[in-house]
Amino acid sequence: MSVKMAVGAVTLCACVAQAWQVPSWDARITEQGAVKERIGKTWCGHVQGMCVTSNAMYFSYHNQILKTDWYGRSLAYAVTTPHGGDICYWNGRVYTGDVYVPEEKGERARARISVYDAETLQPIKRRFLDEWNGAADGITCLDGVIYLGMGRVSPPGNKCWYGKYDAETLQPIGKPFVVDHGYDSTHGSQNLATDGTYFYSGHYCEDENAKTPCFIVMDRDFKVVGRHVFGCRQGFDVVPGGKDGAVRFIYCTTINWMSPKAQPQLPVMALVQFAELKDGKIEDITRHCIFPKPLKR
């Protein structure tokens, strides 16, 4: 994911400079204004990725893309063909890294990049990555270049593939390359974001309950410079507001989304939360509920 913002004189993510503030973090979405379990007539699945701009949040689901304001009120949505992945914003467009899952048996799944108008979510273009026999998921944009998480080398493995693509033509820039994250992940880069100086990559790990450093910080040459424990596997982005060298993130997690019996004391909902990376540690700094679903079906 990438974010359209500027802090002071530093323009992040090579997007249009625009100073902005995150709306009240205490905002709580009521059931009346919340996004329901189904958008249109189609089951949308769990959140795959998210990105934000100064006036909107974008969420990628299994087969939907949703745009809301900063209070969770729906602004636009698009139905897509599964399986959706991560999402990022750049230059008036949103991009998703997907895996097309064919309905016909015998046809192989294919990685692709899809592009939508950020205002309306109308599709603009898509490109199947036929040069790559694997998945696509984590995605972000910097200086007009799409950076794409393209899966692991072997299952399980600590080496994952990344690729670079022109944001206008969607044509590849060079060949995919491998990064050794130093630990085993199960699906490669699930979510990817940048602040213009570093890339941040979130992963699923073999042992989900262990305190595995599944959040990787890389420099612009994709050299690993940090590893952290951070549960952001359903989407995150970088937002302004960090002070004294801190990097601030917004991220999304779901509760009871796929199984309402997982935590019966809680409603089915997603949480939009905030965290900061400072002095080598990531800490949750605040949270608010968004998209609570009615328990009555």
PLM regions and their residue ranges:
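Beta-strand-rich domains and repeat architectures in extracellular enzymes and scaffolds
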Residues: 35-63, 83-86
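Blade-loop segments of beta-propeller domains
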Residues: 72-111
